[in-house]
Amino acid sequence: MKIYTQRLEDISPDQAFETVELTFDTRQKSRFRAALASGVDIGADLPRTGILRSGSYIATQEGDVLRVDAKPERLMKVTAQTEFDLLKAAYHLGNRHVPLMLTPTALYFEPDHVLAEMVEGLGLAVTETDHPFEPESGAYAQHSHDHRLSPIKALHHVHS
């Protein structure tokens, strides 16, 4: 089984690669097993540097390259009569720290009947659908929780 251990920023236009579709849950993990469309099993043991976004590339030590695509999965789709109503739903779902995919005409989140009922209570339509899930990364996606000042930052830290 090929084991993919490196994340690639990009690849050259002539680079050969295979593709794999993964759910959002799997793309959040640094270690996983999956199967290519051909049925070939692969594994990943990647650095913990964040989510694999659809279109990301990973590689083996031997140089084999794999493009990761978002796999269609069961989601709740929120639609509204007005853009403002859709904005209100995004606000309320965001307050619950729900992974949320935004499009100009709809919001998508992982199935949760309590959240669906809340959104329907706001007067919006909620339907189940199969769709690739690429939620927003959020303002704190790469945020460290160490709020101490480093010695370098401390030299420039000014209170006004």
Curated annotation (Swiss-Prot):
One GO cellular component term: cytoplasm
Biological processes per GO annotation: protein folding; protein-containing complex assembly; urea metabolic process
This protein's UniProt keywords: Chaperone, Cytoplasm, Nickel
Location relative to the cell: Cytoplasm
Cytoplasm listed as a keyword: yes
Stored SUPFAM superfamilies: Urease metallochaperone UreE, C-terminal domain (SSF69737), Urease metallochaperone UreE, N-terminal domain (SSF69287)
Keyword Endoplasmic reticulum: no
Gene3D superfamilies reported in the protein's UniProt record: Urease metallochaperone UreE, N-terminal domain, UreE, C-terminal domain
GO MF: nickel cation binding; unfolded protein binding
CDD domains hit by this protein: UreE
Primary role: Involved in urease metallocenter assembly. Binds nickel. Probably functions as a nickel donor during metallocenter assembly.
Similarity comment: family membership: Belongs to the UreE family.
Protein name: Urease accessory protein UreE
Taxon lineage: Bacteria, Pseudomonadati, Pseudomonadota, Gammaproteobacteria, Moraxellales
Gene label: ureE
